[in-house]
């Protein structure tokens, strides 16, 4: 949903609960992966499959056991937001094409500011086609990496699996996981730098002296889904609302619907995952299928 300035707020208020770690420190850990979120980040210049393969190799090198969780059907509250995102992708693609044409035809010199604009447009215009998602699933399956499809949104199920003890943490850049109450979140997972940043929600709540329900309410009130004009930030809520023990709710019905959307108490009933018996573990590899998927994406193998 987008929570304005939440990350900056947490870094300033709770630095001791946010730690940079090497991937070696994740050895033997079981992690749930917000699949769509990671695939978007890996799909740089259309190189999704090579980047995903490199990520799989890294997981296996450190014996990190991942479970990729793919999105299911989004809730009604988010369908309008998805339409907006599709519109933004189209606009970004048009702006990107126009900008690149200007750079080429007008000999515009590249600088850091221009590169930043290009990078932002590239990220915004990126979309995952069903073909790419299916190819990613084929590669995961061939390499023995488990994956499941959530009934609704992946982040909800990811938080449920972490909080149920099935996984140690969730890998995602989606700040919604904090609103879901996910106890441990891994951001900035870097295959090339071999490190990541771990957020501990229990430490964050303790430092802020907040209950999860209050923290979730703060996230919702300053979210893009609730406050569309973009004026409310975490700082506003923290300094003006919570400090005075009062919080102004403009649209109570919308607020309650969004808060309920982030409660994960019934996700186990909607999921095929039985936390009492479910185990995240590597499956058997299918070398021929792996080779086929990679060859379809430009890999060349020496048959000798």
Predicted regions and their residues:
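Noncatalytic, basic helical substrate-engagement surface that gates or grips nucleic-acid strands
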Residues: 2-13, 25-150, 157
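Short amphipathic alpha-helical interaction elements and helix-loop-helix interfaces
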Residues: 142, 146, 164-167, 225
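A short acidic, often aromatic-flanked loop/helix-cap motif at beta-alpha or helix-coil junctions
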Residues: 153-157, 193-194
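Non-catalytic nucleic-acid-binding/docking modules located in mid-to-C-terminal regions
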Residues: 13-27, 31, 62, 193-304
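Extracytoplasmic/secreted cell-surface and envelope-processing proteins
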Residues: 77, 179-180, 229
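A short alpha->loop->secondary-structure connector
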Residues: 86, 185-192
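Acidic, metal-binding active-site segment of PIN/NYN-like and related structure-specific nucleases
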Residues: 158-188
């Amino acid at each position: 949903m987008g929570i304005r300035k939440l990350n900056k707020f947490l870094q300033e208020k709770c630095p001791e609960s946010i730690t940079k770690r090497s991937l070696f420190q994740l050895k033997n850990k079981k992690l749930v992966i917000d699949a769509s979120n990671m695939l978007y980040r890996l799909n740089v210049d259309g190189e999704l499959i090579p980047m995903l393969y490199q990520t799989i190799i890294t997981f296996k090198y450190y014996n990190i056991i991942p479970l990729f969780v793919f999105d299911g059907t989004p809730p009604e509250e988010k369908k309008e937001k998805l339409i907006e995102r599709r519109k933004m992708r189209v606009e970004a693609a048009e702006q990107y094409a126009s900008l690149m044409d200007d750079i080429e035809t007008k000999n515009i010199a590249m600088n850091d500011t221009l590169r930043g604009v290009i990078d932002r447009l590239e990220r915004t215009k990126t979309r995952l086609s069903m073909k790419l998602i299916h190819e990613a699933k084929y590669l995961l399956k061939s390499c023995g990496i488990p994956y499941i499809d959530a009934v609704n949104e992946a982040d909800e199920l990811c938080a449920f699996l972490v909080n149920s003890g099935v996984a140690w943490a969730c890998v995602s850049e989606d700040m919604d996981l904090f609103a879901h109450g996910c106890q441990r979140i891994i951001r900035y997972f870097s295959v090339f730098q071999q490190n990541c940043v771990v957020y501990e929600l229990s430490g964050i709540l303790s430092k802020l002296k907040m209950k999860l329900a209050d923290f979730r309410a703060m996230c919702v009130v300053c979210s893009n889904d609730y406050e569309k004009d973009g004026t409310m930030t975490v700082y506003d809520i923290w300094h003006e609302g919570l400090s005075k023990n009062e919080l102004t709710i403009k649209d109570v019905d919308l607020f309650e619907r969004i808060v309920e959307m982030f409660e994960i108490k019934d996700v186990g009933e909607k999921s095929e995952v039985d936390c009492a018996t479910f185990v995240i573990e590597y499956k058997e590899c299918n070398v021929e299928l792996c080779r086929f998927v990679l060859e379809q994406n430009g890999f060349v193998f020496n048959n000798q």
